[in-house]
Curated annotation (Swiss-Prot):
HAMAP family recorded: RapZ_like
Alphabetical list of InterPro entries matching this protein: P-loop_NTPase, RapZ-like, RapZ-like_N, RapZ_C
Family designation: Belongs to the RapZ-like family.
UniProt: GTP binding residues: D62, M63, R64, S65
Keywords: ATP-binding, GTP-binding, Nucleotide-binding
Taxonomy, superkingdom: Bacteria
Record-linked SUPFAM superfamilies: P-loop containing nucleoside triphosphate hydrolases (SSF52540)
Protein's name in the database: Nucleotide-binding protein SSU05_0620
Any GO molecular function: GTP binding
Positions bound to ATP: G12, M13, S14, G15, A16, G17, K18, T19
Keyword Isomerase: no
Any single Pfam family the record assigns to this protein: RapZ-like_N
Length: 295
């Protein structure tokens, strides 16, 4: 891990997408904090410097008074010359009409609208934030951006600072008899394949064991299906990554989640990890063994 701290200060107009932005940075592997008082930033950075957990930080700072701006300006001047710190200010903006529409949709009041008129609060906030916007290295206008598109823009601008992939694939096996995985994006059913359970010498093994893996894969229908499966999955992965999805969960299921699905999930993970960041898990692989031991 680099010794240099990478800090992104996220600010901008209320309703312009700061919540989506900070969630996007979290997906990119940043340590994130929402609504940090500017005066606490130097002390916070001092603590982070002594921590080995993460060298990438993104935090939201809201400017809601003239004193807040003077505070953040003093803090930025203080940290600007630090040799071990690379920091940027990301400013999120949108047109007044779009911000008004968003507030009406959520039925929330603007934090600076003392008389309840949203537009008055927006105009006051824009006046207070103008100097900070002018000194920001990154300005994103979210007027025409959906939350998904904003995530994509942030990923394109900031993911390059991260040496680790921002898109991860989770390949898992499971048993249909125990229920579908709630977090699965893609589910594939291999219950139509010959079942090793009916081979007594294989019954107590799993798809991770060579005899079971070989038995599952030696059948022509297994090879044909796997070829189609890999051919389906590989072309769509760049699309999921392009859309800003941080984790894609691919689940392969058989009856009990011990033999066929485990073998297929293992082979799929082995092939995908040649080009992608892949984690693997086998939810129900040992469930039958645990049930037998309890009985």
């Amino acid at each position: 891990m680099s010794d240099k701290l990478h800090l992104v200060i996220v600010t901008g107009m209320s309703g312009a997408g700061k919540t989506v932005a900070i969630q996007s940075f979290e997906d990119l592997g940043y340590f994130t904090i929402d609504n940090m008082p500017p005066t606490l930033l130097p002390k916070f950075l001092e603590l982070i410097r002594h921590s080995q957990d993460n060298n990438k930080i993104a935090l939201v700072v809201d400017m809601r008074s003239r004193s807040f701006f003077s505070e953040i300006r003093e803090v930025l001047d203080e940290i600007e010359g630090a040799e071990d710190l690379d920091f940027k200010v990301l400013f999120l903006d949108a047109t007044d009409s779009e911000l008004v529409a968003r507030y009406k949709e959520t039925r929330r009041s603007h934090p600076l609208a003392a008389d309840g008129r949203v537009l008055d609060g927006i105009q006051l906030e824009r006046e207070l934030l103008a100097p900070l916007k002018n000194m920001s290295q990154n300005v994103i206008d979210t007027t025409e951006l959906t939350p998904r598109n904003l995530r994509k823009v942030i990923s394109e601008q900031f993911a390059s600072q991260d040496n680790q992939p921002s898109f991860r694939i989770e390949v898992m096996s499971f048993g249909f008899k125990y229920g579908l995985p709630l977090d699965a994006d893609l589910v594939f059913d291999v219950r139509f394949l010959p079942n090793p359970y009916y081979k007594l010498e294989l019954r107590n093994l799993t798809g991770l064991d060579a005899p079971v893996f070989d038995y599952v894969m030696e059948h022509q229908e297994s090879e044909e299906f796997y070829s189609h499966l890999l051919g389906l999955i590989e072309p769509i992965l760049p699309g999921y990554q392009k859309e800003g999805k941080s984790v894609l969960t691919i689940a392969v299921g058989c009856t009990g989640g011990q033999h066929r699905s485990v073998a297929f999930a293992k082979r799929l993970a082995d092939d995908l990890e040649k080009n992608w960041n892949v984690n693997r898990s086998h939810r129900d692989k040992d469930r039958r063994k645990e049930t037998v031991n309890r009985s």
